[in-house]
UniProtKB/Swiss-Prot annotation:
Name assigned to this protein: Hydroxyacylglutathione hydrolase
Organismal lineage: Bacteria, Bacillati, Cyanobacteriota, Cyanophyceae, Synechococcales
EC number of the protein: 3.1.2.6
Transmembrane helix is among the record's keywords: no
Record GO biological process: methylglyoxal catabolic process to D-lactate via S-lactoyl-glutathione
Function: Thiolesterase that catalyzes the hydrolysis of S-D-lactoyl-glutathione to form glutathione and D-lactic acid.
Gene Ontology MF, one: hydroxyacylglutathione hydrolase activity
PANTHER family: HYDROXYACYLGLUTATHIONE HYDROLASE, HYDROXYACYLGLUTATHIONE HYDROLASE GLOB
Keywords: Hydrolase, Metal-binding, Zinc
Residues engaged in binding Zn(2+) 2: D58, H59, D140, H178
Cofactor note as given: Binds 2 Zn(2+) ions per subunit.
InterPro entries: Clx_II_MBL, Glyoxalase_II_hydrolase, HAGH_C, Hydroxyacylglutathione_Hdrlase, Metallo-B-lactamas, RibonucZ/Hydroxyglut_hydro
Gene name of the encoded protein: gloB
């Protein structure tokens, strides 16, 4: 039985990820419930679990309504965030491995955007489901072409988190929770106007977005080649980039 991955764009720029296998599904960071319920019902799916990468309202806002419709669904979130994600039914921490839909998910600590931010990693390690994975549900830590703002962590925290993502295989899909790619790459082209890989990717993403298509998922390899934050050699370099990006205003 093969898994499939689906992206639901919601609100202004959020992306809710749905992982389906057979007639069962897992949803990641549901900002709102209605589009998820519509998709599940249209495809005859049963919601088995909700994965929460961090506590921000635009990631957990749809969870209460989803649980009213699917009360048997697990809510998997960081144990360290149990007070801010109170509906969690399974607390996890760095290094934990959980099983959902017959697959293993690894939990990694990528705290920086928030103090208890986690990511969920699925390796390409299942002979019965060979085309699904590797991938990373990375929330707001790693974005296509960027990284999350440092609301509760430091540049050192973000540097460490991005190094953990960089250690994943290049083909790992980057399933982040916001469609910020075009603006991120526009900023990057201003910093490195002669970088052909960045400018080429920016033009590709601009074309996708002009048609209303998502640029996601990305890949770890693409981020290594074109994401200035992933290329930072020190936490100090990352801090300088983050400060510059925080004060940048797109035209």
């Amino acid at each position: 039985m093969h898994s499939t991955l689906h992206a639901l764009p919601v609100l202004q720029d959020n992306v809710i990820w749905i992982w389906a296998r057979g007639k069962n599904a897992v949803v990641v960071d549901p900002a709102v419930a209605e589009p998820v319920n519509q998709w599940l019902n249209a495809h005859g799916m049963c919601l088995r679990a909700i994965l929460q990468t961090h506590h921000h309202a635009d990631h957990i806002g749809g969870t209460p309504d989803l649980l009213r419709e699917w009360p048997q669904a697990e809510v998997v979130a960081a144990t360290a965030d149990r007070l801010r994600i109170p509906l969690q039914t399974r607390g996890v921490a760095d290094g934990d491995v959980i099983n959902l839909l017959g697959r293993r998910l690894e939990v990694i600590d990528v705290a920086a955007h928030t103090s208890a931010h986690i990511a969920f990693i699925i390796r390409n390690d299942d002979d019965q489901d060979p085309s699904f994975g590797p991938l990373a549900f990375c929330g707001d830590t790693l974005f296509a072409g960027g990284c999350g703002r440092l609301f509760e962590g430091s540049a050192q925290d973000m540097y460490r988190a991005l190094q953990r993502f960089a250690a994943l295989p290049d083909e790992t899909l980057v399933c982040c929770a916001h469609e910020y790619t075009e603006a991120n790459l526009r900023w990057a082209t201003e910093q490195r106007p002669n970088d052909v890989q960045i400018t080429t990717r920016h033009q590709t993403v601009k074309a996708l977005r002009s048609r209303g298509d998502l640029s996601l998922p990305s890949s770890i390899g693409a981020e290594k080649r074109t994401n200035l934050f992933m290329q930072a050699e020190t936490a100090e370099q990352l801090a300088e980039l983050r400060s510059h990006k925080d004060h940048w205003r797109s035209s």
